[in-house]
Amino acid sequence: MVMEGMGMAAAWAAGDLWVLAAAVVAGVVLVDAVVRRAHDWVRVAALGAERRSRLPPGEMGWPMVGSMWAFLRAFKSGNPDAFIASFIRRFGRTGVYRTFMFSSPTILAVTPEACKQVLMDDEGFVTGWPKATVTLIGPKSFVNMSYDDHRRIRKLTAAPINGFDALTTYLSFIDQTVVASLRRWSSPESGQVEFLTELRRMTFKIIVQIFMSGADDATMEALERSYTDLNYGMRAMAINLPGFAYYRALRARRKLVSVLQGVLDGRRAAAAKGFKRSGAMDMMDRLIEAEDERGRRLADDEIVDVLIMYLNAGHESSGHITMWATVFLQENPDIFARAKAEQEEIMRSIPATQNGLTLRDFKKMHFLSQVVDETLRCVNISFVSFRQATRDIFVNGYLIPKGWKVQLWYRSVHMDDQVYPDPKMFNPSRWEGPPPKAGTFLPFGLGARLCPGNDLAKLEISVFLHHFLLGYKLKRANPKCRVRYLPHPRPVDNCLATITKVSDEH
């Protein structure tokens, strides 16, 4: 009887534990729901009943945090598309959703129609990047400029890096740099290389030559190291404490400012003494001498911020896309063969008197252009951009209140199976036929703030792929290694690989 009593007591105790556990879980769920509902109400209460009823579906999440944890969890788990997919699953395919991110009430625009409307409306929407990003890139850069200032600086800086004449000027240097890099990486003494790291260095050398010609190796190395830390802090939580990515990014920005200011001071001092630099004007020269219609020149902090922005964008995107395009080609032998055949045909058509490729030759590389576009779509280097509503505006039939932030999810557009069938498949042939509808292909944005260096970036990528296809192969050390998606998609081993020269004719 005693044993039976003890058994019954144990059973009752176990039952009590289950009840207690269930009560705790229910309590946590209830508290979570109450806190989320309260935060949502606080954020929208001031809008009034009529405006609240017109908001898109969604939720604000927890105070201070909002959807940031869900965003970071999705991107760090290796499934970045899960973040937007959770909104679609819970609230339907409305195209826009409300949430709370980067310390602000935010609308997520995830369809071509919604993104196009926001990007083409320069009066209704201004730049709305998070304060942390503005701090890192610079308050005088494009991410924080008014429409008029952006138009003025863009007009000044876009012409020297776009258009037939400008690109022709840079083609020879790009070609020489690519050829020398491939030969060095494929030499027996190089062994395995971090392919992405080397590509970033190569593209950085190119962009520094364009913007700051004559910069010595020490300056380039100091800048390149700092940009690595800067980029890791771009999409991180803005926690300015030792050990956090944002803390290191702030230190990197200070180093960048110091190095660029030193170069700028040297240019100004030389000009004051009447010294003239040899060679053509570079971007820094143009920024120093630029005047607006009222005769106002750019201050040093404006020049430094514009340079930080351009130098970063000019090598990060090109380096990453070049790596992924090479990897995709190597993983798809049929696509590789077709792209290589196109390059061989173009080489056969070049007159014997012509020294190297011309820009017109690159215009003939139709399939290679499709490879680049498909890589841009699949990789999504710039997966999101930011705007802020200047007034109440309706998008997809829903209200975006004045002052609210808008995130334009380019990645969601590019990976939408209703826009691109089988979106995870690398298929350059999907670009055959008419050009894509406006709003469906957004690797460089759209409208007045379209990335001014897009043509230069595509030329760099194409030059590299041309030489790689004709003479080299890539063998990855860890082809199945995990991909990290922040700040940009990359293999965790930076694509550790062996580059082998396979043709002596090239």
Swiss-Prot record:
If you read the UniProt record, what top EC class would you report for this enzyme, in one word? oxidoreductase
Keywords for this entry? Endoplasmic reticulum, Heme, Iron, Membrane, Metal-binding, Monooxygenase, Oxidoreductase, Transmembrane, Transmembrane helix
SUPFAM superfamilies documented for this protein: Cytochrome P450
The Swiss-Prot or TrEMBL record lists the needed cofactor(s) as:
heme
**Cellular component aspect of the GO annotation:** endoplasmic reticulum; endoplasmic reticulum membrane
InterPro entries recorded: Cyt_P450, Cyt_P450_B, Cyt_P450_CS, Cyt_P450_sf
> TM segments?
11-31
EC number(s) given by UniProt: 1.14.14.107
- Locations listed in the record: Endoplasmic reticulum membrane
Keyword Transmembrane among record annotations: yes
Q: Which Pfam families match?
A: p450 (PF00067)
Which biological processes are named by the entry's GO terms?
Answer: gibberellin biosynthetic process; gibberellin metabolic process; pollen germination; pollen tube development; pollen tube growth
User: How does this protein lie in the membrane?
Assistant: Single-pass membrane protein
CDD domains per UniProt: CYP90-like
Q: In which pathway does it act?
A: Plant hormone biosynthesis; gibberellin biosynthesis
What reaction does this enzyme carry out catalytically? ent-kaur-16-en-19-oate + 3 reduced [NADPH--hemoprotein reductase] + 3 O2 = gibberellin A12 + 3 oxidized [NADPH--hemoprotein reductase] + 4 H2O + 4 H(+); ent-kaur-16-en-19-oate + reduced [NADPH--hemoprotein reductase] + O2 = ent-7alpha-hydroxykaur-16-en-19-oate + oxidized [NADPH--hemoprotein reductase] + H2O + H(+); ent-7alpha-hydroxykaur-16-en-19-oate + reduced [NADPH--hemoprotein reductase] + O2 = gibberellin A12 aldehyde + oxidized [NADPH--hemoprotein reductase] + 2 H2O + H(+); gibberellin A12 aldehyde + reduced [NADPH--hemoprotein reductase] + O2 = gibberellin A12 + oxidized [NADPH--hemoprotein reductase] + H2O + 2 H(+)
tRNA processing: present as a keyword of the record?
A: no
PANTHER family of this UniProt entry? CYTOCHROME P450 26, ENT-KAURENOIC ACID OXIDASE 2
Q: Which family does it belong to?
A: Belongs to the cytochrome P450 family.
Task: Describe the task this protein carries out.
Answer: Involved in gibberellin (GA) biosynthesis. Catalyzes three successive oxidations of ent-kaurenoic acid giving gibberellin 12 (GA12), a key step in GAs biosynthesis. GAs, which are involved many processes, including stem elongation, play a central role in plant development. Required for pollen germination and elongation.
Name by which UniProt lists this protein: Ent-kaurenoic acid oxidase
Q: Which organism is it from?
A: Oryza sativa subsp. japonica (Rice)
State which gene encodes it.
Answer: KAO
